[in-house]
Every structure is written in structure tokens, then in C-alpha cells.
Amino acid sequence: MSLRAAALALLIGLTACQRATAPAPPPEKVLRYAFPAAETGFDPPQLADLYSRMVTGHIFEALYRYDYLARPFLVVPDTAAGLPEVSTDQRTWTIRLQPGIYFADDPAFKGRKRELVAEDYVYTFKRFFDPAVKSPLFNSYRQEGILGLEALRERALKSHRAFDYDTPVEGVRALDRYTILFRLAEPRPRFIFQLASSGACGAVAREVIEAYRGHEMEHPVGTGPFMLEQWRRSSFIRLVRNPGYRTVTYDAHPNADDAEGQAWLARFKGRRLPMIDAVEISIIEENQPRWLSFLNHEANLLYGIPEDFTPQAIPHGRLAPNLARRHFQAWRALASDRYMAYFNMKDPVVGGLDPAHVALRRAISLGVDVARQISGPRHGQAIPAQTVVAPFNFGYDPDFKTEASDFDPARANALLDLYGYLDRDGDGWREQPDGSPLVLELRSQPDSFYRQFEEIWLRDMTRLGIRLTVREAQWPENLKAVRAGQYMIWQAGYTNASPDAQIGLEQMYGPSIGGLNLARFKLPAYDALYDEVEALPDGPERLERLRRMLQLATAYAPMKLLVHRVVNDLAWPELTGFRRPAFGVQFWEYIDLTAPAAAAH
């Protein structure tokens, strides 16, 4: 053998030896859990559903976010360099960005690193006003009074031309590469809440939107800790750590008496985020398969124990002994949400502000047995809702009582009799005052959990002599129909993204029809009070007007308030650091998984 051949053989042998002795890479840390409803897509301005926003909230980044451990809440900078500079009249907000933040790599950037700059947020906020985007959040941002944006929208609508993103507006502009200025028509003391929703107003890059025109929902590209790797619509979502994510370390501000929060802070402070490598989400709409998937360790987190299985998982509010022996972890919290039955105020049967239709809605509301819904399908995991103001919001009072939670079939029947909803032909069913059939239609979902509610509704309406039919469809189809006004009654929930009552109040605000006002309710007196409440600082004057709005909502009954939900989460022992966000959706980056369990899937 030649010297050269011998040397080559030795080199090959050494290389093989090194390969044989090289340590195996650490197992991938993957958070696995399931959504109970399908996502709709991943373009923030087009989204109105919680589950899609939960994904976008980890891909995109807003200027601010909610501290992970602080309770009830603390707003802290995300991409902003600090808190905003706010004028004394609360109409001018100046915000500086951290330099050196980059979007995830994408072909839309043509091979260059793309830094986040102030103009990206200008573009992001303009998109809410672009008629072509059809943002369900348009009215939420319109009512903030960002000067010039609504006029730019009107110009596009009247000219039938594309929205002009290049025209500067007074209300949102870049003063320099890293400084954003907002100017508002009226004082907005709580404007920072609108800047703290990564799932809604996280920065998007114009190049990405233009590169994937018409397919924006499929191509989310942000600056956040995760990026979309795989998506099978309504089935499976996989996200992976963004390799270009800047250095962000674990820091939070738990209350002094928060033992768990203090323990998480002591354990993780200074760790680089995210601490896990990937997130895999399955869409499992039926409760039993979702529960079994978790027990079979196909998921390591059960984000919301299905109500059907709370007696098995947490009997009497305590972790079941068989789960405790296996070191499972459980958390329980009252959600900042409200669950209600919307009435379509434009529907000829249940809509309208005339006395007869108001009486019909109030009678239906009095005839709905909320206590049965709580004790039955919900297995005690809810409390009756009195108003649209959710727990932990300004204006929420646990002792405040309205007619909304009353169950009084006798009074309901009396109201129906008084306003001419009578059984004229003796068949046991009421007719409308003009003699035409009275038939209600409830939109629902085709699974065992929702069918329990259908049975309660059918029984309750039969007790009143009212026919009820049910139309079942998947969640995204129902939401699409409801947003288009193609429904009569729909039962659904809404989780707060901020600690203000405004989100609940907006659900009956006339200008938000087509957005959050799914009931399509329009009452000038209510709208005038809403405008006042928006401009006032928190305090007695604002609370007094808020209460007047709630009285009007109770009187006209555009929705039947049902419950505020109690949420229960369950995790395998390898998951550490979890806490359900009180507001916002971000938690993936703050959790960790122990290596053995991360590899056990």
C-alpha cells in the first residue's frame, strides 16, 4: 500500500471512529396539544377566532405584550424599546423600536436579512383599513380615531381603486427608522391595549403580503419566536423555533405572594427564549378523542379539560388520585370571557327594536335554563354571566345582578301571551302576532358536547310552546355565516384580549356591525354612551356610563348572556413553567420540557 493510500485509510478510519463516538443530538423538545376548533388561517388582520390568533401570536410580535407571570396584568415592551411617550391629552403616542430585530428568512426578501422598522407597523395598521382585507377588527381600530386612516379607506371605496398604502397619514407615521408616532382624534387612555396584541397587530412585512397576494393566510412571516413549518388545514399545525429570533431571556414580574410564579422566575430567569424547539397542534373537535389523545401521551398539555371529563380529571376541584400518583399537573382559573347566545337583530323573526320583538327575545332569554347548562354539559365549570363585562375587566362586579341570569318560564310565557305570540290553531305551538309560524333556528356544531346544549335548548323552547330547529356546521363555517348575518341564533364565547370592558361593549356597538358586533345591534343611545366611555379615563364617571349601557343591553336583549367559563388545564409531569395567560395568547416560549419525556412520544 502506498503512503498516500495508507494515510487516506487512516483518515477514513478516524472519521468513522469519531462518528461512532459522537454524542447523539439532544431530543427535540416538542409541545404537543390540541385545538377543539379549526383554525381559519394566519394573517392577523383577517382573524377573529382565538385559535388562529394563538398561532399568529407566536409568529408575529406587537409593540407591547402582557407580562407572563404578573397578575392581574402588566403591559411591558415587546419590540418597543420602552413604554410610549404620551401627551397630556392622551392623543399623541410616540414609540421607539428596538433596533436589530429581524423577520424570519423568507423568499419574499430575496436572500437579504430584513430588519423590523417603524414603517412595518405603519403598514400593519393601514391593513386594518384596507377594504380588500375585510378585517373583522376594522371597527375596533377605527374607533381609536387614528387620524387619516378612515379617510384613506373612504377614498379607496369611492374611487373603486386599490387602497393607497404609499399616501402618508397624520395618525400613524414613521418619524425615523425606529420611531413611530400615533395621533388620535380623541383621548384614548387605554390605547396601549390595542398595541399589545401580537395575534392581531403583530408587524407584517409589505414584501411578504405582496409576494403572496391572495394567499396571505398561508404564509405568515414575522419576527416572533416561532415560524410555521407545516399546515394541513383543519387537521395539523407544526411550528418550529425561529433560528433568527433575537436574544430574549426569561424575565417576568410575579406578585410577591405568588409562590408558583416566584418559583418559575427563580428557575428560568436569564434562560434564552424559546426554551422548546417546536409546537405541534392537532385539531380534535370531539371531546372524548381529545381527552384520550392526552391520556395516551399523544399530547403533553391539555389546554382546557373538556367539561365532559372534569369529573374524572378534577373531581370536586382537586386532581384525581390516579392522576396525582402519576404526577400530572392541573391548573384552574376563571376566564376573562363571556359565553352568550347571539340574536340576529336583522332577522325578521327575532330581530328588531319594536316592543313585540324585544318581548320575544326577553322571553326566550327568561326561558333558557342557564343553571342546567352549568350543571349538565359544563359540569359546574362556569358561573352565570350578568353582563358582557368579563371577569378581571374594568367595570366587572361579581355582586352585580341583572335579569340576564334569571330563569323564569312563567314570566316568559306571560310576555309571549301579552305581545301576541299565541297558539291560534291549538297544535301546541305558538304563532307570530301576524299568525305566521314561529320557528327559531339555532346554529350549532356536530359533536356530542354541543348536542347536549341543543337538547337543553329544545326542551326549554318546547316548554314555551316555541318550535326550535338546529342547523349544524363546523366552527369556521358557522363563524363565516354569522359574520355575514346568515343566522337567527348562535351560541358562542368570546375571550378577552385585554383587561378593558371595551371588547364586550363593542359587541353591541352599531359601527362594529360586520366586525365584533355579530348581533348586528344598533341603538343610537347605546352608541353615544359607547363613544363617551371610550374617551373617559377609568373612574366613577366612566363606570356610571358603562352601567347605563348595560341597562340598555338588558332591556333590548340583543343577546342572551349565559356564563363566564372556568378553565382547567392539565399537563404531563415533563412540562414545566406553564401558566394560562390572563390576557393575550403567548405562553409557548416560556415553558420547558424535560429531555426524557420530550423524547418519549
Describe every region a protein language model picked out.
Residues M1-A7:
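Bacterial N-terminal signal peptides that target proteins for export
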Residues A7-A16:
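Hydrophobic helical h-region of N-terminal Sec-dependent signal peptides
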Residues C17-A24, Y68, P84, T92, ...:
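Extracytoplasmic/periplasmic ligand-capture domains
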Residues P27-L31:
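Short structural boundary motif marking the start of a folded domain
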Residues A34-T88, V221:
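N-terminal lobe/hinge region of extracytoplasmic solute-binding protein
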Residues G148, T179, P189, C201-A205:
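Aromatic-residue-lined binding/catalytic grooves and analogous aromatic/hydrophobic interfacial grooves
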Residues L562:
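Active-site-proximal polar cores
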Residues N568-L570:
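Extracellular/luminal re-entrant pore-loop and selectivity-filter region at the outer mouth
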